[in-house]
């Protein structure tokens, strides 16, 4: 296993803790109660999003000197660290997937892809691909990191949604999100 893959997996899995896409995974699971198409939708959206980000990063890496890339990577990691301190919020438009005609899988792909646009994990993917010059290792690693962070949220949302009213599950998810945001804000456990 190569360095680009391992670092990409770890960086994105950590960056996803408390992120709005993790909350989105929980909300989608609670709403639809169909974990398999949601997991496949998250995987598909992540592969598409991170492949584009990885391609941009690989191109930037070929255009810039190693010194500039080292500084850019350092700045992106410091920026991600600061970004984690700012709690994300799940916009109503991102969470509102009831009006779609694409089914659970399609709703998940579209919603998750849009939620990831400009997100810290997408920016990390660009920076990592530029630094390591390993498109496949970075995209595979960042995708695995996303799945490590989001599949448990989907399974948790699905499991408890059967026992609890959806409204209560959404409330619990909101509280979890606020707690994770506060932890990130104060640097406790994140």
Which role fits each region the language model picked out?
Residues 144-153:
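Hydrophobic alpha-helical transmembrane segments of multi-pass membrane transport proteins
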Residues 94-122, 128:
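Selected transmembrane alpha-helices and immediately adjacent juxtamembrane segments
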Residues 3, 33-97, 103, 152-163, ...:
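Membrane helix-loop-helix hairpins that form the core translocation module of multi-pass transporters
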Residues 86-92, 120-124, 136-139:
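Short, structured loop/turn "capping" segments at alpha-beta junctions
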Residues 8-10, 106-110, 155:
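Short hydrophobic "helix-edge" motifs at membrane interfaces and signal-peptide entry regions
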Residues 182-190:
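Juxtamembrane boundary at the C-terminal end of a transmembrane helix
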Residues 13, 17, 47-48, 82, ...:
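Hydrophobic/aromatic residues within the transmembrane alpha-helices of Major Facilitator Superfamily
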Residues 2-65, 124-144:
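Juxtamembrane transmembrane-helix termini in multi-pass membrane transport proteins
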């Amino acid at each position: 296993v190569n360095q680009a893959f391992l670092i990409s997996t770890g960086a994105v899995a950590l960056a996803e803790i408390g992120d709005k896409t993790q909350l989105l995974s929980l909300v989608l699971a609670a709403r639809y109660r169909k974990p398999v198409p949601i997991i496949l939708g998250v995987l598909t959206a992540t592969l598409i999003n991170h492949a584009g980000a990885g391609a941009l990063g690989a191109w930037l890496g070929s255009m810039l000197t190693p010194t500039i890339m080292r500084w850019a990577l350092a700045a992106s990691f410091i920026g991600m660290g600061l970004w984690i301190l700012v709690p994300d919020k799940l916009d109503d438009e991102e969470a509102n997937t009831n009006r779609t005609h694409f089914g659970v899988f399609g709703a998940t792909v579209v919603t998750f892809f849009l939620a990831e646009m400009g997100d810290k994990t997408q920016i990390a993917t660009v920076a990592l691909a530029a630094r390591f010059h390993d498109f496949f290792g970075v995209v595979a690693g960042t995708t695995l990191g996303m799945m490590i962070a989001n599949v448990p949220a989907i399974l948790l949302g699905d499991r408890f949604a059967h026992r609890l009213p959806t409204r209560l599950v959404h409330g619990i998810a909101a509280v979890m999100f606020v707690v994770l945001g506060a932890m990130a804000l104060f640097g406790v456990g994140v």
